[in-house]
Structures are given as structure tokens and as C-alpha cells.
């Protein structure tokens, strides 16, 4: 099986998790980045930009990803929870995966430990692209838990 890691990270918490995991797996890694970067000021990013995108279902333009996604059996998708679901650049990424035939395993992390956020994310991802097989991965787990889970994919 050939696996790819795709992630979004603003504060680098998710980036650090992905880097820790990839010392074990050595998968190809792609970062989803908003075309116009979010403010580096937390309050502006969280309470203005990200909140507006979620409330208005805005999927912002993202930087081009030069990847043949169908050359991978599975995509491991990592992101933080923003406003009870995934960050909207992830929505853009999922929208743009027109003909992906593999599985997308979803991994989310959040400051709060409410499992409803993972449920929201899975529901919202599936509503954006009904042709993709989204598989619930882990929510707010340790690097070791992630490694053990990913080894079974």
C-alpha cells in the first residue's frame, strides 16, 4: 500500500505531529496552504478570518498541490479543529479531489476533547465530496496511538 499524508496547520501543532509520525513511516507529505495566508495574529485568524469562512461556508483558494493523488492507495488527512469542524482550506482540498479512488483517513486534533468535533468533521467532509471514502481515524490521540493505528492501514 502506498500512503500519502496531507495536512493543514496554522500554529504548527499539526505540522509537528505529522513530522513526528513521519519519522516512523517516511510517507510523502503535502501541506495544504491557503493562497492568501491567514493572519499570524491568533485573534484575527480565529475570530475573524476562520470564523467567517466556517459561518459562510467559504472554501478559500489554496496553493496548488502538484500531486497525482490516484498514485496513492490511501491519504492520511490531518488538521486541527476550527469552529467545531475542519479548517476551510481542507474543504477546498476535498472539493478539488474530483476523481480520487483511494481512502481518506481523517485525523483531527483540538484544544478541547469533545468527540462531537470529529463527528462534525466527518459529516461535513462527506457532504463536500460524496465520491470519496472517508474513514474515521483518530481524534486527540498521542503520537504512539497514531503510529499503532496507521500501522494497521
How would you label these PLM feature ranges?
Residues 69-70, 95-103, 114, 129:
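Short, conserved loop/helix-junction motifs that constitute active-site signature segments
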Residues 105-142:
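Short, glycine-/small-residue-rich phosphate/pyrophosphate-handling segment
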Residues 14, 92, 109:
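Ser/Thr-centric signal marking residues that sit
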Residues 89-93, 120-123:
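Short alpha-helix in the alpha/beta-hydrolase fold that links the catalytic acid
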Residues 77-78, 106:
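Redox-cofactor binding/interface segments in oxidoreductases and associated redox assembly factors
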Residues 1-77, 84-88, 130-131, 145-153:
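N-terminal beta1-alpha1-beta2 submodule of the flavodoxin-like/Rossmannoid cofactor-binding fold
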Residues 83-84, 113:
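Acidic catalytic loop of the alpha/beta-hydrolase fold
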Residues 94-95, 126, 151:
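Generic structural signal for well-ordered alpha-helical scaffold segments
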Amino acid at each position: 500500500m502506498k500512503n500519502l499524508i496531507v495536512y493543514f496547520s496554522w500554529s504548527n501543532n499539526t505540522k509537528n505531529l505529522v513530522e513526528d509520525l513521519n519519522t516512523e513511516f517516511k510517507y510523502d507529505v503535502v501541506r495544504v496552504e491557503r493562497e492568501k495566508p491567514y493572519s499570524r495574529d491568533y485573534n484575527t485568524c480565529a475570530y475573524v478570518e476562520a470564523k467567517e469562512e466556517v459561518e459562510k461556508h467559504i472554501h478559500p483558494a489554496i496553493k496548488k498541490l502538484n500531486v497525482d493523488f490516484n498514485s496513492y492507495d490511501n491519504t492520511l488527512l490531518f488538521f486541527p479543529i476550527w469552529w467545531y469542524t475542519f479548517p476551510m482550506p481542507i474543504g477546498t482540498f476535498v472539493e478539488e479531489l474530483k476523481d480520487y479512488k483511494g481512502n481518506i483517513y481523517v485525523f483531527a486534533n483540538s484544544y478541547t476533547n469533545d468527540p462531537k468535533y470529529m463527528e462534525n468533521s466527518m459529516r461535513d467532509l462527506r457532504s463536500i465530496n460524496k465520491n470519496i471514502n472517508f474513514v474515521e481515524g483518530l481524534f486527540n490521540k498521542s503520537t504512539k496511538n497514531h503510529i499503532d493505528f496507521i500501522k494497521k492501514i
